[in-house]
Amino acid sequence: MRDIAIVSFAQAPSEQPPGQTETLMLLPTITEALAAVGLTRRDVGFTCSGSADYLTGGTFTFVQMLEAAGAWPPIPESHVEMDGAWALHEAWVRLQHGDVDVALVFSSGRASLGTSLRETLTFQLDPYYLAPLGADFVSLAALQADAVMARTGRTERDFAEIVASRTGGDVETLLAEPYLVAPLRAHDVGPPVDGAAAVVLVAGDRAKDLCERPAWIAGIDHRADPHYPGMRDLAVSRSAALAAEKAGVAQGDVEVAELHAVCTPEELVLADALSLSDKVEVNPSGGGLAANPMMVTGLVRIGEAFRQIAAGRGRVVGHASSGPCLQQNLVCVLEGRN
């Protein structure tokens, strides 16, 4: 296996001007990611993107995003109808072939295009039983919260303490807020925003030439649970636990974990699934509870994990999720090597 590292990460601001297209969000973001390590678009040998046509309301809308990649002469390109973290996994696999040394990964999503994210995400559900009921992701997250409380003895106070630890807010004040969908309140759910992000992957010794402290991908894996929520225990995530095992999370001490949790109960489920000790700092960036750019949040978690390595950390976990109630999970272990 080739050693592959993240050498650069860039993210667009969560607040975008009205009418901003995903291509225009991506253009400066990709340029920033490449320029940070002295690369241009001509240096890229493979590119893979992640986005969702359901958010834009059109077919093959990801094709126009390629204008932001600006690959000339043309290079191999791929796309996943998923969060950009899965595009990163595909790029990692592509670099293992050995004929390409530099890969560009990017993703984008706009939550501000009319239809609410709660309505749009019903399309990912079973089309016969759940989707017609309008079982939105917040309502399903509330069911998961109930399952977590029933199984583990945790309470709404535990949810509020997660939020307070990130915002500096008062737990009692948070608990006094009205329910969004009981037992969840508005602060328990990350706000949907527009977003874009880009990551540069480089294989072998070239990564050391481009970056003072590359984040080496020591392990990466993704697994999925049954699609139908009623066929699994929502208080646990077997797919996240298996992905963590295959990625080698337990093979060393983890200093920081960036978890793709857009609802507070998800963070508790993931911390248990990855067997994170109390010494592990979870989501110092704020995580998906601070902002949830759909199709980008998972890639941002890995990007934030890279930033931790760049800042001197030794071993960090980046995590991404997809589907209702943490149905599919990707775990990436990053290491800084002296």
Task: Name each model-derived stretch.
Residues 103-152:
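Flexible glycine-/small-residue-enriched beta->alpha junction loops
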Residues 40-46, 157-158, 251-255, 278-279:
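Short acidic capping loops at alpha-helix termini that bridge into adjacent secondary structure
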Residues 2, 20, 27-28, 51-104, ...:
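Claisen-condensing/thiolase-fold acyl-transfer catalytic domains that form or cleave C-C bonds
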Residues 37, 152, 208-211:
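ACP-dependent fatty acid/polyketide chain-elongation machinery
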Residues 134-184:
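Glycine-rich, mobile lid/loop segments that gate access to catalytic sites or pores
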Residues 19-37:
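Short catalytic helix/loop segments, enriched in acidic residues and glycine
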Residues 2-18:
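Generic N-terminal amphipathic, Lys/Arg-enriched alpha-helix
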Residues 9-12, 47-52:
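Acidic/polar N-terminal loop/beta-strand segments that form early-domain functional surfaces
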